Amino acid sequence: MILTTLTPVKYPIHTGNRQVFVGYGNPTASYNQTTGDILSVAFTPFFIDAVLGLVVTTDGTYIGVPVPVGGVAGAATWAIFWYTFALTGTPSWAAVGSGVNISAKQCQLTVIGGA
């Protein structure tokens, strides 16, 4: 997933030598359950230090868990692992299978990082 800034005038916000970036994106067209949905920030040399919270699609049907898959040192690679999500009855999650296309969904998330 490539994150695009919500409002270029407002983001990224500098906090010390790091930046807070709020953006939106669409999950990948062909999800890979093993590697997840690799996350990057568009238009900047931006390395992600942390992703704040879970990622939920705007229609509430999918929930994503951000994971540092390339280690925890500087410039770690982050991926989102997607699950179907239901609030009816007993809330439940089920892993999205490989090859599933959820690219029509949209989500918003916040990352901290910098160049």
Question: What do the PLM-derived regions correspond to, one by one?
Answer:
Residues 1-37, 103-115:
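Extracellular receptor-binding modules and their adjoining Ser/Thr/Gly/Asp/Asn-rich linkers
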Residues 28-96, 101:
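Extracellular attachment/recognition segments
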